[in-house]
Amino acid sequence: MLSKEIIARLIETAKNYADNAYCPYSGVAVGAALLCSDNIILGGCNIETGDYAAPSFGAGDTAIAKAISEGYNQMLALCLYSKDRLVYPNATTRQYLCEFNGDMKIIVANDQTYEVIDRLGAIYLFPPAVGDGDQTGA
């Protein structure tokens, strides 16, 4: 269970990272805060590109990449923040989260409200993420 204090810290961190977003195409700035072991919180933001051959990066993706590159692979919760709407993890972020902890809490927040999703699998926006042991070679 995440305390209200931790949730507030995650939302504030994600909100601060949203200020750094590069989103000239969608206009939707998203920030992320990733709670890792030892209560370390790392952040990220979305980075868009106009080149169809080059991928854009979701805020969750950049936070996860930061965590892994800094040696944190025990992830406990992810918060995504956007000013006016609730933004859920994209398919790539969901896959990364499943690789490291498919049972982590997801917090989606905006300036008016927030929602805590108890388990990554509770988000049915995309087909199920490929988890450990699910790669059948098909």
Language-model features: where?
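Short, electropositive, low-hydrophobicity segments enriched in small/polar residues
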Residues: L35, A54, Q95
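Short beta-strand scaffold segments in enzyme catalytic cores
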Residues: S26-C36
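Feature captures the catalytic cores and cofactor-binding loops of soluble hydro-lyases/lyases
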Residues: G58, T62-E70
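C-terminal binding/interaction regions
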Residues: M1-N20, E70-A138
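Hydrophobic "anchor" residues
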Residues: I40-I41
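Compact, glycine-rich, soluble single-domain proteins
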Residues: C45-D61
